[in-house]
Design a protein with these regions (language model features):
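Conserved helicase motor core of SF1/SF2 NTP-dependent helicases
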Residues: 1-68, 72-131, 135-162
Length: 162
C-alpha cells in the first residue's frame, strides 16, 4: 500500500535487520514469522548463560523452569492463569522491553504455527508473537500443555536437571 500510494518513498529494509538483543536462535524463529522481510541477524552477546535459545517446556515442568530461570511470563490475555509469584505481562505490554528469559503461554493458533510453519500465523497473533519472542536477551520458552507432549521442529524440549 505505502509503495503504491507514495511512489517517491523509499523503504529502508537494511538498517533494522540487526539485533543487539537476541541470540541467533531467537532471531531465526522471529524471522520465520515474516519470511518476506529481510532476515534479522544477531549481534547480541547473551553473556555466560548455559541456557541460550528457544525451548519447549512441558506444563508439569513449569514450576521448576520458573525457579531455575525466573523468566517473565508472557500471555495473550489476563484470563490465562499464570504463577502470580513471578513477573507476568501480556504480550503487547512487553513491547519495547528487554528481559533475560521469557516463558510464553501460547494460544492455540501460536502452537499450531510452531508445529507447522508452512502456513502464516494471521494478523494480531503474528505481531504479538513477534513482540513476545523478541523481548528475550537469552532464552524463550513455550509451554506445551498437551497430554502426550508435542514435537516441534528445531525446538528442543527443556529437561530439568536432576
Amino acid at each position: 500500500y505505502v509503495k503504491e500510494k507514495c511512489k517517491t518513498l523509499e523503504i529502508d529494509d537494511t538498517t533494522l535487520n540487526v539485533s543487539y538483543r537476541n541470540p541467533q536462535q531467537i532471531c531465526d524463529l522471529a524471522n520465520q514469522l515474516y519470511p518476506d522481510m529481510t532476515p534479522c541477524q544477531s549481534k547480541g552477546i547473551p553473556g555466560n548463560s548455559q541456557h541460550i535459545g528457544v525451548y519447549l517446556v512441558k506444563s508439569n515442568d513449569v514450576e521448576t523452569y520458573l525457579k531455575a530461570y525466573n523468566p517473565v511470563q508472557l500471555r495473550d490475555s489476563v484470563r490465562k492463569a499464570v504463577n502470580p509469584e513471578y513477573s507476568v505481562m501480556n504480550y503487547g505490554n512487553s513491547k519495547g522491553l528487554t528481559m533475560e528469559h521469557v516463558l510464553i503461554y501460547p494460544t492455540k493458533p501460536i502452537m499450531s504455527w510452531l508445529k507447522d510453519r508452512s502456513k502464516a500465523l494471521e494478523g494480531q497473533s503474528r505481531a504479538k508473537l513477534y513482540v513476545a519472542i523478541t523481548r528475550a536477551r537469552v532464552s524463550v520458552a513455550f509451554i506445551d500443555d498437551s497430554k502426550r507432549g508435542c514435537k516441534i521442529p528445531d525446538i528442543p524440549v527443556w529437561v530439568p536437571s536432576e
